[in-house]
Amino acid sequence: MFKLLSFANAPAIVRANQKDSYFESRLHNQLLDVVKAIKGSHFVHKYPEELRTLATALYLCLTTLVGSKTLGEEYVDLVYVSRDGRKIPKFASRFGFVVAYVLFPYAVRQLLQKLKAQQSRLAQLVSGVSYMNVMDLLNLHLALFYFTGKYYQFAKRLFGLRYAFGYRVDKNQQRARGNYELLGLLIIFQTVFKNVANLRKLWGATKTVQDSGDLIYRFRDQTSDVIDLADPKVLPYLPEASRTCMLCLSPMKDPSCGECGHVFCWKCVLDWVKERQECPLCRAKMRESQLLPLR
């Protein structure tokens, strides 16, 4: 197809998407009624996300995948064109868009839920960071759309599906964007301010840990004598079997313990806690600020 049609602008694409969201919601409700009649309410409450994903897949498979317009596209009179606007997208591009738009978000949500269900610190960190990064990227992509009018969904950008008006428009109508550029600026400012606030919180938490460590270091520097348990006269209340550090396997120097009560060399346990905030023996939580030198 030659480039005869004008690319659609942001207001028209947003109106089409709003209409599609409305009809997709109605299809979802009708699907729930059918499934509830067949499988019962328990099944519907057990798989709400899967049923919503199925409704979206049905809507797009009955329209975009087979080359027909969605109801929102019919309402605004939009057609799909290639990136350069000269061709109609092939079936492979439409199929890729449907799969990416429907299944990829579902797969990501399932993965994040599994990571969150795991109690390991790494799993919680990855799930939290991944969710924040994905949301920030989607917000920035939406802001880019408000500025350019291209690719409302990221999946359409990935497979090169652009919208064009199904009729000829004058230049004034084509340039009309309303206040969408202002919305794009607001989204960018919101994302930046949110991340700056998160960085400040992270910096504050790191600073607190560093300050706690500095206080402990200054405390140790102020004590001139090193407490060496190789001398049985030093801290005689400690039994012989408990005077060896389990980290360096030598008699303890400057013995220190955490809230769990296990005792180690000051330098050994401090180096350990900097890498892993847990007791080397019982895995109880242990931080620099919680270490207590024994006297």
UniProtKB/Swiss-Prot annotation:
GO BP: protein import into peroxisome matrix, receptor recycling; protein ubiquitination
Where are the annotated RING-type zinc-finger regions?
Answer: 245-283
Topological type in the membrane: Multi-pass membrane protein
Residue ranges, Cytoplasmic side: 40, 121-122, 200-295
Task: Give the location in the cell.
Answer: Peroxisome membrane
Q: Which UniProt keywords apply?
A: Membrane, Metal-binding, Peroxisome, Peroxisome biogenesis, Protein transport, Transferase, Transmembrane, Transmembrane helix, Transport, Ubl conjugation pathway, Zinc, Zinc-finger
Locate the residues binding Zn(2+) 1: C245, C248, C265, C268
- Which class of enzymes does this protein belong to? transferase
Regulation affecting activity:
The E3 ubiquitin-protein ligase activity is stimulated by PEX12.
Q: Which residues bind Zn(2+) 2?
A: C260, H262, C279, C282
**Substrates-to-products reaction catalysed:** S-ubiquitinyl-[E2 ubiquitin-conjugating enzyme]-L-cysteine + [acceptor protein]-L-lysine = [E2 ubiquitin-conjugating enzyme]-L-cysteine + N(6)-ubiquitinyl-[acceptor protein]-L-lysine
| Regions crossing the membrane | 10-39, 41-62, 109-120, 123-148, 180-199
GO molecular function, a single term: zinc ion binding
Query: What family is this?
Result: Belongs to the pex2/pex10/pex12 family.
Q: Which PANTHER family match?
A: PEROXISOME ASSEMBLY PROTEIN 10, PEROXISOME BIOGENESIS FACTOR 10
The entry's free-text remark on domains says: The three subunits of the retrotranslocation channel (PEX2, PEX10 and PEX12) coassemble in the membrane into a channel with an open 10 Angstrom pore. The RING-type zinc-fingers that catalyze PEX5 receptor ubiquitination are positioned above the pore on the cytosolic side of the complex.
Q: What does this protein do?
A: E3 ubiquitin-protein ligase component of a retrotranslocation channel required for peroxisome organization by mediating export of the PEX5 receptor from peroxisomes to the cytosol, thereby promoting PEX5 recycling. The retrotranslocation channel is composed of PEX2, PEX10 and PEX12; each subunit contributing transmembrane segments that coassemble into an open channel that specifically allows the passage of PEX5 through the peroxisomal membrane. PEX10 also regulates PEX5 recycling by acting as a E3 ubiquitin-protein ligase.
Per its record, how is this protein called by name? Answer: Peroxisome biogenesis factor 10
Q: Which organism is it from?
A: Pichia angusta
Q: What phylogenetic lineage does the species belong to?
A: Eukaryota, Fungi, Dikarya, Ascomycota, Saccharomycotina
